[in-house]
Curated annotation (Swiss-Prot):
One of the protein's GO biological processes: translation
Protein name: Large ribosomal subunit protein uL3
Biological role: One of the primary rRNA binding proteins, it binds directly near the 3'-end of the 23S rRNA, where it nucleates assembly of the 50S subunit.
The keyword Calcium belongs to this UniProt entry's keyword annotation: no
tRNA-binding keyword on record: no
Keywords, ordered alphabetically: Methylation, Ribonucleoprotein, Ribosomal protein, RNA-binding, rRNA-binding
Family that this chain belongs to: Belongs to the universal ribosomal protein uL3 family.
NCBIfam families documented for this protein: L3_bact (TIGR03625)
Classification via Pfam families: Ribosomal_L3 (PF00297)
Domain of life: Bacteria
Species for this entry: Shewanella woodyi (strain ATCC 51908 / MS32)
GO cellular component: cytosolic large ribosomal subunit
UniProt modified residues of type N5-methylglutamine: 153
GO molecular-function terms, A-Z: rRNA binding; structural constituent of ribosome
Length: 212
């Protein structure tokens, strides 16, 4: 486990290597992560850092939030996140400290977590990649139907977890082992190879890869 940071998905572009190869990259803005609270084994039963980033309009901040940020002595951010710490991590980090993108300077691969784009209510073909049925040859009603969803009198029910139509997307997704292409500490940018979950401007959690 290693310290992660909160970022914002800016969008995708591409960069070129010296030999002319094109690399598709996602640009992630990682502004300073301000520590608002330090969780400890003694008081909370686990070790973690609570951080905020970005800004929030003053009229959108509740009184409890305002008090929490004021106690930490940091500017109010757009949200609060917790990053778990291993036993040997986070020593010396105190409330009010700032964590920046340069902690990824020596990291080769990262895991990126975000909320996937919501797709609304979708059928089995789009949601689960089911095969469509015949368009002709006697089929006139069930072209995109799920087909059979179970057996007969035994068991006489549909099993829990059966893949069917329903709400798709808008859930927590992690993409693992993305190559770090560039760290731009001056502009607080991290460029990773490939796509990451979520829409433009969505919040992301970036951590060093656990499987690297």
């Amino acid at each position: 486990m290693a310290i992660g940071l909160i970022g914002r998905k800016v969008g995708m572009t591409r960069i070129f290597t010296e030999d002319g190869a094109s690399i598709p990259v996602t640009v992630i803005e990682i502004a300073a992560n301000r520590v608002t609270q330090v969780r400890t084994l003694e008081t909370d039963g686990y070790r973690a850092l609570q951080v905020t980033t970005g800004t929030k309009k003053a009229n959108r901040i509740t009184k409890p939030e305002a008090g929490h940020f004021a106690k930490a002595g940091v500017e109010a951010g757009r949200g609060l996140w917790e990053v778990r710490l291993a036993d040997d991590e986070g020593e010396g980090i105190e409330v009010g400290a700032e964590l920046n993108v340069d902690i990824f300077a020596d990291v080769a691969k990262v895991d990126v977590t975000g909320q996937s784009k919501g797709k609304g209510f979708q059928g089995g073909i789009k949601r689960w990649n089911f095969h469509a049925q015949d368009m002709t040859h006697g089929n006139s009603l069930a072209h995109r139907s799920n087909g059979s969803i179970g057996q007969n009198q035994t068991p006489g029910r549909v099993f829990k977890g059966k893949k069917m139509s329903g709400h798709m997307g808008a859930e927590r997704v992690t993409t693992q082992n993305l190559d770090v292409v560039r760290v731009d500490a001056e502009r607080n940018l991290l460029l990773v190879k490939g796509a990451v979950p979520g829409a433009t401007n969505g919040n992301l959690i970036i951590k060093p890869a656990v499987k690297a």
